[in-house]
Structures are given as structure tokens and as C-alpha cells.
């Protein structure tokens, strides 16, 4: 069965962006379509962390701006979104809980550029996400796909090919700006 979102972006789903810097040097922009039509809760969680609409307990904006891609594995994926601890251990949601349930597994990890939730097991979605750099069908049914890269796959490839030590980038890969288009 063909993925219902294997083509260009729709007119109704939100488009968000990350501006990326590597070691303080701007690399460019990644634009992503969020599949709000298939995974509305997951897409909205990510969208609000992109726009800064989400507030922490002190009423301050929280989200992906100035956070890192903390895990990079060539020929697999790039992972980020831990603005809580910055190292892959933090979790936060817009729903007032540290984690939320898997919404569905309708969409598949069938190509590079798939945007999916990182987790630590069933129903442990938070703020962390990853972008695939190849098809990863072994993740189907385990991680919720909620978007796709629509522009800037060259930037994803630059991140994928950055030098790492034990899957951690040697230089900081920072989301310097983010928001909704």
C-alpha cells in the first residue's frame, strides 16, 4: 500500500521550519510538512514547540529554538528536540504531561526525510523527534510518523555527515530559529 503522504505537501497541513547552524556557522533551512490530517495531536505538539506558543511552568516560551540535534547516525537518522536537558534524556509535551500516547501508526518510515517521534517505548512521546536519512521499515509500528521534509534535505544530509563521537556531533548542531510558515 502506498503511503498517503509520499508526494508534495498539501495545502491544509502546517509547514514549519528550522534554521540550522553547525559549530556556529549557518547551514540553511529545513522546511517540514506536519501531517495534522493523520496525526493531529502529534503534529500540534511539534508545531507549538516550533512556534514557541508552548509555555513552561514559569510562563516562559519553551520549544526547539536554540536546542540541539544531539544524536546523529549516518545512513539512519538525525535526532533532536530535547530542549529540557539537551542530551536525549528530557521529555515534555504541550499536554501538561511529560509524555503522551502513540497516536497511530498509519504512516510509514518508507524513505529519507520522514519526521517521526523519538521514544523510549510504547506511549512515551514527548518533545524529541528524528528525521530519517533512509527508509527505516523496522521502525514501523514503534514510532509515530507525523511529517516529512519538503525542502532542505541537503541540510539534513549535512547534519547526517557531520563528524560524531559515539553518535554525538563533535560540533553543536543548533536550531537557531524555528516557526511556522
From Swiss-Prot:
Record-level GO BP terms: protein folding
Domain of life: Eukaryota
Leader peptide range in chain numbering: none
Sequence ranges assigned to domain PPIase cyclophilin-type in this UniProt record: 17-180
PROSITE patterns: CSA_PPIASE_1, CSA_PPIASE_2
InterPro entries on file: Cyclophilin-like_dom_sf, Cyclophilin-type_PPIase, Cyclophilin-type_PPIase_CS, Cyclophilin-type_PPIase_dom
Keywords, alphabetical: Isomerase, Nucleus, Rotamase
Reactions that this protein is recorded to catalyse: [protein]-peptidylproline (omega=180) = [protein]-peptidylproline (omega=0)
Name of the protein this chain belongs to: Peptidyl-prolyl cis-trans isomerase H
Species in which this protein is naturally found: Aspergillus fumigatus (strain ATCC MYA-4609 / CBS 101355 / FGSC A1100 / Af293)
Encoding gene per record: cyp3
